[in-house]
């Protein structure tokens, strides 16, 4: 079937569903869609992700959410019970094997974790645990729960997660393929995520609002806002077509105050612009700001400065929520205690800037207009390549270098502006403008500075 941005028919969905449920043994326990609907309908409002986001936006508050996930269900429950005392929203981060549909290896990881008495996986293998165990998780906790992963083919994971009572689902056919996988075609991952979005849309049609969040940071470090914005908007459009009504678009911190504030503000405005111009008016839109996703210094005091800076920018920019980091980022997967430290530092800063939104100023306004011009140039080309179809256009845009590198269709005046900025930096640093500048910038924060000057 040729890829198109078109709502899946009931027959198409049900035929595919039967194949999906057979991909692992726990699929047989979620065959009854109505059972999942009834379970979701019984979830109290204070545990529903979309309502928490809607309330936060209305009140002008920024919610906090960590990342967290371990192999064994009892340990995962205890971890999240600890974290929920300090955060507004809870995650369940999925392990690397599940992200690649390698459920046999995830099962081995569970066995080794039991034997070792500690997690041997970097997340929770939801598919292996199945719906009964996951319902025990969602019933025990008192905060809204989201699945966070990195899965190109997340269809079975989506089915089990929704039937288990999770009320938000992160990812998309672009953001969970290009940064994460090298053997999955974009055409396949977009089509697989149309299935995921249609599943969420079916819950919506039964009165259950599931929040969907494209993954904003992509590869994690120093992504130009116009690239991440374009992909977030594309994935939002794809989800809306499948009847999803709650969309959270995201962005990863780059470190420049004016650019980060402008990015969050322009992201919301551009998403509304494109969603509505293509006929989608019945939806809820929120934003997420990811604290610095690059390298961290080993010194905890320095790490706290980075965390606090990210929280301040998230709050002042008006982001609906912030994904927090821990002071142990340089060492690996953080402990619960380290995660709580990051949450507490973030909450202190969020409380302090809650009524101090960043004021309009020429520098931010200029950056907003620059980002908008760049995004419009790219998205207009994507639609052109697809003859009006954003799904087909996206595949062709990556092939042509429009959405990645090589042929990004920015106007000449904007290209000249960027060229002048790079040339000015090269003169200041006394070196030729090369890719080494990017490498130096990626490493700069872990060396206690923002710009990687020699």
Curated annotation (Swiss-Prot):
Its cofactor is adenosylcob(III)alamin. Pathway: Amino-acid degradation; L-glutamate degradation via mesaconate pathway; acetate and pyruvate from L-glutamate: step 1/4. One of its GO terms (molecular function) is cobalamin binding. L-glutamate binds at residues 67, 99, 148-149, 170, 176, 180. Transmembrane segments: none annotated. Pfam families: Met_asp_mut_E (PF06368). The keyword Protease does not apply. It catalyses: (2S,3S)-3-methyl-L-aspartate = L-glutamate. Its EC number is 5.4.99.1. It is an enzyme of class 5 (isomerase). GO terms for biological process: anaerobic glutamate catabolic process; glutamate catabolic process via L-citramalate. Adenosylcob(III)alamin binds at residues 69, 122, 179, 296, 325, 329, 333. Keywords: Cobalamin, Cobalt, Isomerase. NCBIfam families: MthylAspMut_E. Belongs to the methylaspartate mutase GlmE subunit family. Heterotetramer composed of 2 epsilon subunits (GlmE) and 2 sigma subunits (GlmS). GlmE exists as a homodimer and GlmS as a monomer. Catalyzes the carbon skeleton rearrangement of L-glutamate to L-threo-3-methylaspartate ((2S,3S)-3-methylaspartate). This is Glutamate mutase epsilon subunit.
């Amino acid at each position: 079937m040729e890829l198109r941005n078109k709502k899946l028919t009931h027959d198409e969905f049900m035929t595919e569903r039967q194949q999906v449920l057979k991909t692992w043994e726990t699929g047989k326990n979620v065959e009854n869609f109505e059972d999942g609907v009834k379970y979701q309908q019984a979830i109290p409002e204070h545990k529903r992700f979309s309502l928490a986001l809607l309330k936060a936006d209305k009140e002008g508050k920024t919610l906090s959410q960590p990342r967290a996930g371990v192999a064994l269900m009892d340990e995962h429950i205890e971890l999240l019970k600890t974290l929920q005392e300090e955060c507004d929203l809870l995650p369940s981060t999925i392990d690397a094997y599940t992200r690649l549909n390698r459920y046999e290896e995830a099962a081995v990881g569970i066995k080794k974790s039991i034997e070792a008495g500690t997690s041997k996986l970097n997340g929770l293998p939801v598919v292996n645990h199945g719906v009964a165990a996951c319902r025990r998780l969602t019933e025990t906790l008192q905060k809204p729960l989201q699945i966070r992963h990195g899965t190109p083919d997340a269809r079975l994971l989506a089915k089990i997660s929704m039937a288990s009572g999770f009320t938000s689902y992160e990812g998309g056919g672009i953001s969970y393929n290009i940064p994460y996988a090298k053997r999955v075609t974009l055409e396949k991952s977009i089509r697989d995520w149309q299935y995921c979005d249609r599943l969420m849309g079916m819950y919506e049609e039964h009165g259950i609002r599931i929040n969907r969040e494209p993954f904003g940071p992509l590869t994690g470090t120093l992504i130009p806002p116009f690239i991440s914005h374009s992909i977030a908007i594309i994935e939002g459009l794809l989800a809306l077509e499948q009847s999803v009504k709650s969309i959270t678009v995201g962005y990863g911190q780059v470190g420049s105050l004016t650019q980060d504030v402008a990015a969050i503000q322009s992201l919301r405005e551009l998403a509304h612009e494109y969603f509505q111009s293509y006929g989608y008016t019945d939806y809820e839109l929120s934003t997420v700001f990811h604290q610095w996703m690059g390298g961290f210094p080993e010194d905890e005091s320095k790490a706290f400065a980075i965390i606090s800076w990210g929280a301040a920018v998230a709050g002042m920019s008006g982001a609906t929520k912030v994904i927090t980091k821990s002071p142990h980022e340089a060492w690996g997967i953080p402990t619960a205690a380290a995660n709580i430290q990051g949450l507490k530092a973030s909450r202190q800063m969020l409380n302090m800037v809650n009524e101090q939104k960043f004021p309009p100023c020429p520098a931010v306004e200029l950056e907003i207009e620059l980002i908008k011009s760049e995004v419009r140039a790219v998205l207009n080309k994507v639609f052109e390549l697809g003859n009006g179809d954003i799904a087909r256009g996206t595949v062709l845009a990556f092939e042509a270098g429009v959405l990645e590198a090589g042929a990004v269709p920015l106007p000449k005046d904007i290209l000249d502006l960027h060229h002048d900025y790079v040339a000015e930096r090269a003169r200041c640093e006394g070196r030729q403008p090369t890719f080494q500048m990017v490498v130096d910038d990626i490493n700069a924060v872990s060396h206690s500075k923002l710009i990687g000057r020699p």
